[in-house]
A protein has these predicted regions:
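N-terminal subdomain of lithium-sensitive/metallo-dependent phosphomonoesterases centered on the IMPase/IPPase/PAP
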Residues: 1-104, 281-283
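Residue-level signal for inorganic ion chemistry
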Residues: 34-38, 61, 72, 81, ...
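A short, compositionally biased
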Residues: 43, 117, 145-149, 232, ...
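Acidic active-site catalytic centers that drive phospho-/nucleotidyl reactions
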Residues: 61, 84, 102-105, 136, ...
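DPxDG-like acidic metal-binding loop motif
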Residues: 93-149
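Short, solvent-exposed loop/turn motifs
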Residues: 129, 157-159, 245
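An extended, acidic
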Residues: 161-283
Length: 283
C-alpha cells in the first residue's frame, strides 16, 4: 500500500499539462456538485462563535470541508488537506501535494446576508501553486487559475489587468485596523473605498480590475491561498505590507493589487502608524 501511494504521489507531483487539466476537471465537477448540497445545509444552518463575536463557523463550513476531505481520500489518497476547520499540525503545506481550503470565506456574510461569500480552494505541489479556485456560490460563478494556462471566469479567459494609477482605483480594506490618518490619506489618494467582507471576493474585484487593491492585515493561509496563482496569471502584485513575499503556509498582513498602485498604497500604509495587526476585525 505504501509503495502504491508513493507511486501516485510521484506521478501527481510531476503533472504534465494534460494531467493538470484532468485534475482541474475533477475538481470543477466536485465544486459544481455543491449546488445540490449547499441549499439544504443553509436551510438547516447552525452557527457557532470561535475566537470572537465576528469569527463564526456553521455546519455549512464543516460539511463542505468534510466532503472535500472524503473526496481526496477516495480519489487522491496521497494528497493532504490544509483547511480552516481542522487541526493542521501534521500537514506540511510546503511538501508533497497539498490542498488549502476555506470552505466558506465570508461566513458572517452568509449568516447575516445569505450572500457575498465564496469557497476558496487551491492546490500546491512541492510548495508551488498549480490550481486555484474561488467559487462565488450565490452567483454560481466559478473562477479558476491554472499554472501557465491563465485565469478563467466560468471557463471564459480573464484578461490581464492593465496598470492604473491609485487615483483611478477603488481600494478595499478594513477601516477598523487603520488609524484615522492612514484612512484619510488612502481616501484622499484613491478614487473611493469599498469592503465586501470576504477576502476571496474582495480579491476577485482586484483580479477583474474593479478594485485597485485589497488589503488584509490578518489573513490566514486559507484566506489567500488561491490569490497567489491568480496574481501570477493576471499580472498583479501580491506581497506582505513590507513589499516582501508572503509565506503561503503562514499568511499574515497582505495586499493584492494592480501594479500601478501597489507602491503608492504601501507607502501610505507604512506612514503615520499605519495599520494595527492585532485588533479584532469585523469581517
Amino acid at each position: 500500500m505504501k509503495t502504491y501511494i508513493r507511486k501516485i504521489k510521484d506521478e501527481v507531483c510531476n503533472l504534465n499539462s494534460n494531467q493538470l487539466l484532468q485534475l482541474d476537471q475533477a475538481i470543477r465537477h466536485w465544486l459544481k456538485g455543491l449546488d445540490d448540497i449547499i441549499p439544504k445545509l443553509i436551510a438547516d444552518m447552525h452557527t457557532e462563535t470561535k475566537a470572537n463575536q465576528f469569527d463564526l463557523v456553521t455546519n455549512v463550513d464543516q460539511m463542505i470541508q468534510d466532503q472535500f476531505d472524503a473526496f481526496l481520500k477516495e480519489h487522491y489518497p496521497s494528497h493532504e488537506l490544509f483547511a480552516e476547520e481542522k487541526n493542521n499540525d501534521l500537514v506540511d503545506a510546503k511538501h508533497g501535494d497539498v490542498w488549502i481550503m476555506d470552505p466558506i470565506d465570508g461566513t458572517a456574510n452568509l449568516v447575516k446576508q445569505k450572500t457575498d461569500y465564496c469557497i476558496i480552494l487551491s492546490y500546491f505541489s512541492e510548495g508551488q501553486p498549480m490550481l486555484a479556485y474561488i467559487y462565488d456560490y450565490p452567483h454560481h460563478t466559478l473562477y479558476k487559475a491554472i499554472r501557465d494556462e491563465g485565469a478563467f471566469e466560468n471557463e471564459v479567459r480573464m484578461p490581464k489587468v492593465p496598470s492604473l494609477d491609485i487615483s483611478e482605483m477603488i481600494l478595499s480594506y478594513n477601516p477598523y485596523v487603520l488609524n484615522e490618518h492612514t484612512q484619510a490619506d488612502l481616501k484622499a489618494a484613491a478614487f473611493s473605498y469599498r469592503l465586501i467582507g470576504a477576502c476571496g471576493l474582495d480579491s476577485l474585484r482586484v483580479m477583474k480590475g474593479q478594485f485597485g487593491a485589497h488589503i488584509n492585515t490578518n489573513a490566514k493561509p486559507w484566506d489567500i491561498s488561491a490569490q497567489f496563482l491568480f496574481a501570477k496569471e493576471l499580472d498583479l502584485k501580491m506581497t506582505n505590507l513590507d513589499n516582501e513575499p508572503i509565506d503561503f503556509a503562514v499568511g499574515g498582513p497582505f495586499i493584492i493589487s494592480n501594479k500601478g498602485c501597489h507602491e503608492a498604497v504601501l507607502e501610505i500604509l507604512n506612514q503615520k502608524g499605519g495599520y494595527q495587526v492585532n485588533k479584532i476585525t469585523k469581517t
